Amino acid sequence: MRFVYHPLAKEPVLKIEGESYTHLYRSRRVKSASRLDLRNLKDGFLYTYEHAEITKKHALLKLVGARLLEVMASKKTHLILSVIEIKNIEKILPFLNQLGVSKLSLFYADFSQRNEKIDIAKLERFQKILIHSCEQCGRSALMELEVFSNTKEALKAYPKASVLDFKGETLPASADFEKGVIIGPEGGFSEPERGYFKEREIYRIPLDMVLKSESACVFVASIAQV
């Protein structure tokens, strides 16, 4: 663990309780003499705290230092992924986070599984996964998440995003990944959707094998940092 997340990190005094307390003082057995580095994942600062008090249910920390230390990928990557099974989205979130993806937009394509509903509770769960990933890899800012109800909405929001499909030019490392790369569901895009893409740059992955959507995401995120 590179640091501990706390939404109020930078305050002079912090109270650690609940799940964070259990993890730090019961699982990791942090001692009162040790210092802790914390982040709020918003301002890029690493805050150092000393223990003022440790009780059976909470701990009080006192701020003793702060330094700007941004840990992010050198290139920004925006993936626009059609909704797949929730469990598969959850599996790839840590990988995308570690590979420096700056934003993940989810949208319901024509062939998306409509029974997979992404509500506020699901987004909060996704964010929790990303927070744990940041703590492990050291990333200093959270990946942005958003959801669109259909393909047209996603295209309207990102008019310069390119498309990953079965046909097109080989995806180059020089592509503008910050403008967005649209990745379809397992069954690909419908014909009406392909009609929407006529004015877009179309790329393909240089493999003869058909990749699952989550594999395509990891591939694109990796190429973007080359």
UniProtKB/Swiss-Prot annotation:
Query: Which GO MF terms does the UniProt record name?
Result: rRNA (uridine-N3-)-methyltransferase activity
Main role?
Specifically methylates the N3 position of the uracil ring of uridine 1498 (m3U1498) in 16S rRNA. Acts on the fully assembled 30S ribosomal subunit.
List the CDD domains hit by this protein, alphabetically. RsmE-like
Q: Per its UniProt record, what PANTHER family does this chain match? A: 16S RRNA (URACIL(1498)-N(3))-METHYLTRANSFERASE (PTHR30027:SF3), RIBOSOMAL RNA SMALL SUBUNIT METHYLTRANSFERASE E (PTHR30027)
Record keywords, A-Z: Cytoplasm, Methyltransferase, rRNA processing, S-adenosyl-L-methionine, Transferase
Q: What is this protein called?
A: Ribosomal RNA small subunit methyltransferase E
Q: Which top-rank group of organisms is this from?
A: Bacteria
Primary enzyme class: transferase
Q: Does the keyword Transcription regulation apply?
A: no
Q: Which InterPro entries match?
A: Alpha/beta_knot_MTases (IPR029028), RsmE (IPR006700), RsmE_MTase_dom (IPR046886), RsmE_PUA-like (IPR046887), tRNA_m1G_MTases_N (IPR029026)
Record GO biological process: rRNA base methylation
Family listed: Belongs to the RNA methyltransferase RsmE family.
**Cellular component per GO?**
cytoplasm
Its encoding gene is what?
A: rsmE
- What's the Enzyme Commission number for this chain? 2.1.1.193
Q: Where in the cell is it found?
A: Cytoplasm
User: Is Repeat tagged as a keyword?
Assistant: no
User: Which species is this record about?
Assistant: Helicobacter pylori (strain ATCC 700392 / 26695)
Q: Which reaction does it catalyse?
A: uridine(1498) in 16S rRNA + S-adenosyl-L-methionine = N(3)-methyluridine(1498) in 16S rRNA + S-adenosyl-L-homocysteine + H(+)
